[in-house]
A protein has these predicted regions:
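Bacterial Sec-dependent N-terminal signal peptides
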Residues: 1-30
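Extracytoplasmic electrostatic interaction patches
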Residues: 110-184
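Long, compositionally biased low-complexity segments enriched in polar/charged residues
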Residues: 42, 79-83, 88, 93, ...
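N-terminal export/targeting and maturation segments
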Residues: 23-92, 177-178
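Intrinsically disordered, low-complexity regions
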Residues: 36, 63, 97, 155-156
Length: 184
């Protein structure tokens, strides 16, 4: 009896490990946006391959648009790979940004997602490579945001149940990858 229970536990453990590895593989098999020279980061969700793209927004003079420094678009990988602006609902309740200027001279900004105000991100020009990056802080240390994965399980079309977010980061001091998991 003891060995039979032990065998069941072992089998269940293997199944759980297999499917957790499978979930990681699914995320890794998502398309990576390329060909966007002003890309800051992107968001992907487990429900489909469509991707939300966040890019620097320059004006016609080639300067960063102070009133809207980040533009947000969909890449429709599920259909024709077209690029589309967010609609009103997506922009106002899900993937849009609340942006505030931190330093007008340096053109640095803080922002949060309209759907999740608890975490602040920063758009700052790096003193190292002189490029703009989006930064996220952990224990007062700044990391560069590369992508965000949203795991949705259940809910409805209008109110999906977000199980967790994974923010994939890069440590600019040593170029190491770091993942911050947030359970809302």
């Amino acid at each position: 009896m003891y060995f039979k229970n032990l065998q069941k536990i072992f089998t269940l453990t293997l199944i759980v490990l297999f499917f957790s590895q499978f979930n990681v593989l699914i995320k890794d098999n998502f398309p990576v946006p390329n060909g966007f020279k002003n890309m800051l980061f992107y968001i992907q969700r487990n429900i489909n391959k469509n991707t939300i793209l966040y890019e620097l927004n320059y004006n016609e003079n080639g300067e960063l648009n102070e009133s809207e420094p980040i533009k947000v678009n969909w890449i429709n990988y599920e259909t024709d790979k077209s690029l589309e602006a967010l609609n009103y609902i997506q922009r106002s309740f899900a993937y849009g940004l609340n942006i505030k200027i931190l330093d007008k001279q340096k053109k640095s900004y803080s922002f949060n997602f309209v759907s999740y105000k608890k975490k602040i991100l920063y758009l700052i020009k790096s003193s190292i490579d002189k490029q703009y990056h989006v930064y996220y802080t952990i224990n007062k240390k700044m990391f560069i945001v590369q992508k965000i994965h949203i795991q949705i399980e259940g809910g409805t079309f209008w109110v999906p149940k977000v199980k967790y977010l994974e923010i994939i980061l890069n440590d600019p001091s040593n170029n190491e990858k770091k993942i911050e998991k947030i359970i809302p």
